[in-house]
Amino acid sequence: MGLAHSDLFGCSGCHTPHNAETLPGVPLWNGSETTLTFTMYSSASFQGTIDGQPSGDSRLCLSCHDGANPDFAWMDPQHSFGSDELANSHPISFVYDSALATLDGALKDPSQASTLGATIAEDLLDPESKVQCSSCHDVHTSGVGQSQLRGYDYGPQHGPELCRMCHIK
């Protein structure tokens, strides 16, 4: 396992070695949950049901990436991360299951293999079968400026490999 943002924060950016549960169920978390209310993703073509607010580990990500943390003021304002505006991002905090894949028609069944070694469900979804920030972003990989995208080739031939793990086209 690599170090998330090792160039900037190391492990202590997210973890604290001597405060085992600052948030219930989140061992070694070095922070508090965000208190902002977020504008969630919305689209007429989206077939899933998104939680009213971010859930799961996305809430942990947003404790820093919510636009209120001065340590992240350097983030590109053209991107919607680092703010309470999630309406233009990839949706998070929704169940991705076989029923959604069938209904949508452009999503792979989560029981299919991913390019990471197991199934989409095992590699990318949280324990509640939900898509979260960590579905696409591997927080334990170094490489600031690359958004820590899972299985993404940052070489000259890069393309939408990550997107195609779930999306048919």
What residues fall within each predicted segment?
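C-type cytochrome heme-c attachment and multiheme electron-transfer modules
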Residues: 1-12, 16-169
